[in-house]
Amino acid sequence: MTIKSRLHHILIGVDDLERSRAFYRDVLEMQEVDRPPFKFAGLWFRIGDNDQHLHIIVGEGAMQRTGRPNNPQDVHFALRVPSYRETLDWLHTKGFREDLPADDLRSLMLRPNSITGHPQIYILDPDRNIIEFNCESLD
């Protein structure tokens, strides 16, 4: 079988669901969507305007990045966005800054001239999960 579809969802582990709800809903402005009545707590958020989702559960051990800095070579997920400049400006309004140490939860790691050919911005969520904004252009 060949997989010819697209990514359906990403699952990350967190310590505090309500803190994560506030971050993904209020800071990143993702839409929370209903999830089935599993026997464990969690959250689902829509990624973009399609049926791709971010699934969040309380995780333990290896799922957690406790004490680890913003490092694009570590496990992360990437969100495709149109503009580097607009995304950077938007993240600044949310309190993120590039002059903070890499282990600060509001640090921005910027790669406007990434070797990948796509400008990149990296941030941390409250549980130190790394989020990449993979930009279509610099403008």
Question: Over which residues does each language-model region extend?
Answer:
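Core segments of cupin and vicinal oxygen chelate
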Residues: G13-L54
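Exposed loop/turn and edge beta-strand positions of beta-sandwich/beta-sheet ligand-binding modules
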Residues: K39, Q73, G117
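Helix-adjacent hinge/juxtasegments
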Residues: I57, M63-V81
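Short beta->alpha transition motifs characteristic of CBS
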Residues: S114-G117, N134-D139
